[in-house]
């Protein structure tokens, strides 16, 4: 227990002095420019995603945003004078996003500098695509999951108390004024739904309307939630262990642990609740969902569930609903992860064996990892996007009816290709073919609506080859990727293919 206390104390001692005093300096943009905030080789070279700005993040844009922040008189007047409060008026979204965006830019600077120094020590900066941690999940599913017995499907608990977010940053940041500024955002402007989404009094969920600040706060919160795993990994280093390592990126964090674990669960780090060993444990997370898979028994998974609930409750001082952790056996249940409905069913079979003149049957079982497209949630997502009704019947999309024919076909085709590309890892393609059919017929209905015709007459006039790319795009891509395949293509199309250029989940998948 003393080792755990010492580890947490040591990890939090590496605090960073924040750059808050520089917010009130006129030429902070020069400091930002010198440390890589310009467009040349910057970690922040991406769309600004600020209302009214279509440019990239640059030193000039950072200067303009920071200028808004150190106009304290303007902020005070806007709070006190409701008649002249531009935050409450039609510019509320613009100015609230500007302040939250620039705050996120500033707090990212010391963390990005730490990453740069870490990469410089290795004398070789890997390419950005090599940091995409989703690539490590696919081989884990294919190689490891079929050998495990139980899985805990975990939703990382939130909302959290606003003071918890501040305290998490306080463990690593020494600059008190910057923390006061963060409290100022939470308390004074809690009615900004685009900054943070109020759930209950003083409790907030994260909002994706401000992605920079959202990602920074969310990543800090998740790192604190998973800090115990880093401690366990270091304590178990003397045992046989293999790990894919820790990947840090601004969008998501991920860590997979494959080793023997000795778990200490304590109440507020004062007394030990239990001690147990797990012979084979895996932890995988992507975005706000994680799975904890084990080769152990169901009782062991219940201990892990109780451990997580107690850890979150004692460490973050809020009640974590046990219903957010589902324990399932692979042979009987499925679980959702990465937009797939995954399972490891047991397939019994009988093998005839013959020894001399005697023959007998040997019963055996095989386990195979399967992933399917969850058709019911996908139809719900397509229904929300107005591609079909709640029953899955395709409908026209009137919002796109005013576009040109080529634009309509391109948008439907791009949506179909993205979903087909993402769900190419499914082992059963029937649900994917149904989604393609819905999108194809929805496109035909939209074009027929535009030309004031029926779908039948429209398709007869254009021929049977119309919209054929909805079904042949994946086959064309495979023929280019694997031109020398030695077995029939129809068998290849039934196999799972994980594309490594999947760096984020499709918008429709986020509805699941």
UniProtKB/Swiss-Prot annotation:
Signal peptide: none annotated. One of its GO terms (biological process) is mRNA processing. One of its GO terms (molecular function) is RNA binding. Keywords: Chloroplast, mRNA processing, Plastid, RNA-binding, tRNA processing. It is found in: Plastid, Chloroplast. Pfam families: Intron_maturas2, MatK_N. InterPro entries: Domain_X, Maturase_MatK, Maturase_MatK_N. One of its GO terms (cellular component) is chloroplast. PANTHER family: MATURASE K. HAMAP family: MatK. Usually encoded in the trnK tRNA gene intron. Probably assists in splicing its own and other chloroplast group II introns. Belongs to the intron maturase 2 family. MatK subfamily. This is Maturase K. It comes from Amorphophallus paeoniifolius (Whitespot giant arum).
């Amino acid at each position: 227990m003393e080792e755990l206390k010492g580890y947490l104390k040591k990890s939090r001692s590496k605090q960073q002095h924040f750059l808050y005093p520089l917010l009130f300096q006129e030429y902070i943009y020069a400091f930002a420019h010198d440390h890589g905030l310009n467009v040349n080789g910057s970690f922040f070279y991406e769309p600004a995603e600020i209302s009214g700005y279509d440019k990239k993040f640059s030193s000039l844009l950072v200067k303009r945003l920071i200028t808004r922040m150190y106009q304290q008189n303007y902020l005070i007047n806007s709070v006190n004078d409701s008649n002249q409060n531009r935050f409450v008026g039609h510019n509320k979204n613009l100015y609230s996003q500007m302040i939250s965006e620039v705050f996120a830019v500033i707090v990212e600077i010391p963390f990005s500098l730490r990453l740069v120094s870490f990469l410089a020590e290795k004398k070789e900066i890997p390419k950005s695509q090599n940091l995409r941690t989703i690539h490590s999940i696919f081989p884990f599913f294919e190689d490891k999951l079929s050998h495990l017995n139980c899985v805990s499907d975990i939703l990382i608990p939130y909302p959290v108390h606003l003071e918890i977010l501040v305290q998490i940053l306080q463990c690593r940041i020494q600059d008190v004024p910057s923390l006061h500024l963060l409290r100022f955002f939470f308390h004074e402007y809690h009615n900004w739904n685009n900054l943070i989404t109020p759930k209950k009094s003083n409790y907030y969920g994260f909002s994706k309307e401000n992605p920079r600040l959202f990602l920074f706060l969310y990543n800090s919160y998740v790192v604190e939630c998973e800090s115990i795993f880093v401690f366990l990994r270091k304590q178990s280093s003397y045992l046989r262990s293999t790990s894919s390592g820790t990947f840090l990126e601004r969008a998501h964090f991920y860590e997979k642990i494959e080793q023997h674990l000795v778990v200490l669960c304590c109440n507020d780090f004062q007394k030990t609740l239990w001690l147990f060993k797990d012979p084979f444990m895996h932890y995988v997370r992507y975005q706000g969902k994680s799975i904890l898979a084990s080769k152990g028994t169901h009782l062991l998974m219940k201990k892990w569930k109780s451990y997580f609930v107690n850890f979150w409750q004692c460490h973050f001082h809020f009640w974590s609903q046990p219903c957010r952790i589902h324990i399932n056996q692979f042979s009987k249940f499925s679980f959702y992860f990465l937009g797939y409905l995954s399972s490891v069913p047991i397939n019994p079979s009988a093998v005839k064996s013959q020894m001399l003149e005697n023959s007998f049957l040997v019963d055996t079982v095989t386990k195979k990892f399967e992933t399917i497209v969850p058709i019911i949630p996908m139809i719900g997502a397509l229904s929300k996007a107005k591609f079909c009704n709640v029953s899955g019947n395709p409908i026209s999309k009137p919002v796109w009816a005013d576009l040109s024919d080529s634009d309509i076909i391109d948008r439907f085709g791009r949506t179909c290709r993205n979903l087909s590309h993402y769900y190419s890892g499914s082992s059963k393609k029937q649900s994917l073919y149904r989604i393609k059919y819905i999108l194809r017929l929805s496109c035909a209905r939209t074009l027929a609506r535009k030309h004031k015709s029926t779908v039948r007459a429209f398709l007869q006039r254009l021929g049977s080859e119309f919209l054929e790319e909805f079904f042949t795009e994946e086959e064309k891509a495979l023929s280019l990727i694997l031109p020398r395949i030695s077995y029939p293509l129809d068998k290849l199309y039934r196999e799972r293919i994980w594309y490594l250029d999947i760096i984020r989940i499709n918008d429709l998948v986020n509805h699941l």
